[in-house]
UniProtKB/Swiss-Prot annotation:
<dbReference type="GO" id="GO:0050992">
    <property type="term" value="P:dimethylallyl diphosphate biosynthetic process"/>
</dbReference>
<feature type="binding site">
    <location>
        <position position="231"/>
    </location>
    <ligand>
        <name>dimethylallyl diphosphate</name>
    </ligand>
</feature>
<feature type="binding site">
    <location>
        <position position="74"/>
    </location>
    <ligand>
        <name>isopentenyl diphosphate</name>
    </ligand>
</feature>
<feature type="binding site">
    <location>
        <position position="128"/>
    </location>
    <ligand>
        <name>(2E)-4-hydroxy-3-methylbut-2-enyl diphosphate</name>
    </ligand>
</feature>
<dbReference type="InterPro" id="IPR003451">
    <property type="entry name" value="LytB/IspH"/>
</dbReference>
<keyword id="KW-0414">Isoprene biosynthesis</keyword>
<dbReference type="GO" id="GO:0016114">
    <property type="term" value="P:terpenoid biosynthetic process"/>
</dbReference>
<protein>
    <recommendedName>
        <fullName>4-hydroxy-3-methylbut-2-enyl diphosphate reductase</fullName>
        <ecNumber>1.17.7.4</ecNumber>
    </recommendedName>
</protein>
<feature type="binding site">
    <location>
        <position position="274"/>
    </location>
    <ligand>
        <name>dimethylallyl diphosphate</name>
    </ligand>
</feature>
<feature type="binding site">
    <location>
        <position position="12"/>
    </location>
    <ligand>
        <name>[4Fe-4S] cluster</name>
    </ligand>
</feature>
<feature type="binding site">
    <location>
        <position position="231"/>
    </location>
    <ligand>
        <name>(2E)-4-hydroxy-3-methylbut-2-enyl diphosphate</name>
    </ligand>
</feature>
<feature type="binding site">
    <location>
        <position position="128"/>
    </location>
    <ligand>
        <name>isopentenyl diphosphate</name>
    </ligand>
</feature>
<dbReference type="Pfam" id="PF02401">
    <property type="entry name" value="LYTB"/>
</dbReference>
<feature type="binding site">
    <location>
        <position position="230"/>
    </location>
    <ligand>
        <name>dimethylallyl diphosphate</name>
    </ligand>
</feature>
<comment type="similarity">
    <text>Belongs to the IspH family.</text>
</comment>
<keyword id="KW-0004">4Fe-4S</keyword>
<feature type="binding site">
    <location>
        <position position="230"/>
    </location>
    <ligand>
        <name>isopentenyl diphosphate</name>
    </ligand>
</feature>
């Protein structure tokens, strides 16, 4: 039995940067708060909590003053920065550069089309931290769509500008883009004049899709390691499952079922851009040490 970890799996640079910033700040001995889970992986959140990172939500942020708060890679809406200013909160800003660039693009688009009664549409997960930050650039006027059913939120009589959450699947984005184009045409509008789309998916994420397709085909079984909250994890696991029916999603090694693996199987281990390498190594060690039928 071979048990191989995908060399392309593990943190994207945005998550790696945020975790490094958190560890550097905690090394000074000063208290550090983080607005939301620093990464959508409960095992890593737990590891950093043991080092002293205190996770807070937006309601708790409103009660803080004179302290340090980390902004995670997902980014934040403008009101978070305003609140920090008012309450003398020092922000340690670990917003991913790719997300910040997207926020700026969305704000520029919104400023350009708002007077023309146009609509900013975001293909993403409602309530996701990154989407909250992006929608905040439009004063929360952006329309968030996740499924085809959500297209009914859009007024196809008015211009539409489409963006994507950076961690969504490329396939899903282009499917949504085609559906919107069709609906604009059905409304009797000129598609070129009334619809603009922007593929704002992070290339480190989209490049993982073809890599994972290839990786998944090379093994009898694929164990995909990710936090259940990870949007990117759900998308990439879907890619594995398309290519290899014997792909399984776990948060850690304790979730592996005995029936999944046979003694003669070659096993591939991979994960989301929010999955730490140490966790995949833990899964690898567990499989190698276990007796399989």
């Amino acid at each position: 039995m071979d048990v191989i970890i995908d060399k392309n799996s593990g943190y994207c640079f945005g998550v790696e940067f945020a975790i490094q910033m958190a560890e550097d700040e905690m090394a000074t001995g000063e208290p550090l708060f983080c607005l939301g889970d620093i990464v959508h992986n409960s095992m890593e959140v737990e590891r950093l909590a043991k080092k002293g990172l205190k996770i807070i939500d937006r309601e708790e942020l409103k009660k803080l003053s004179d302290c340090k708060v980390l902004i995670r890679a997902h980014g934040e809406p403008p009101e978070t920065y305003q609140l920090a200013l008012e309450n003398n909160i020092e922000l340690v800003d670990a917003s991913c550069p790719v997300v910040l660039k997207l926020q700026n693009r969305v704000k520029a688009s919104f400023d350009a089309i708002d007077s023309k009664d146009g609509q900013i549409v975001i293909y993403g997960q409602e309530g996701h931290a990154e989407v909250i930050g992006i929608a905040g650039q439009t004063g929360d006027k952006a329309i968030v769509i996740t499924t085809e059913k959500d297209l009914d939120k859009i007024d196809f009589e008015k211009p539409v500008t489409l963006y994507s959450q950076t961690t969504k699947s490329t396939q899903g984005f282009y499917k949504m883009k085609d559906l919107i184009e069709a609906r604009v045409a059905e409304a009797g509008k000129n598609v070129d004049e009334n619809f603009e789309y922007n593929d704002s998916i992070c290339r480190q994420v989209s490049n993982r899709e073809p890599q994972l397709r290839k990786f998944s085909k090379e093994f009898d079984v694929v164990i995909f390691v990710s936090g259940k909250k990870s949007s990117n994890g759900k998308a990439l696991y879907g890619v594995c499952k398309q290519e290899n029916e014997r792909s399984y999603f776990v948060e850690n090694e304790t979730e592996i079922e005995p029936s999944w693996i046979r003694a003669t199987d070659n096993v591939g281990i991979c994960g989301a851009t929010s999955t730490p390498m140490w966790l995949m190594e833990k899964v690898q060690n567990y499989i190698q040490a276990h007796s399989w039928n």
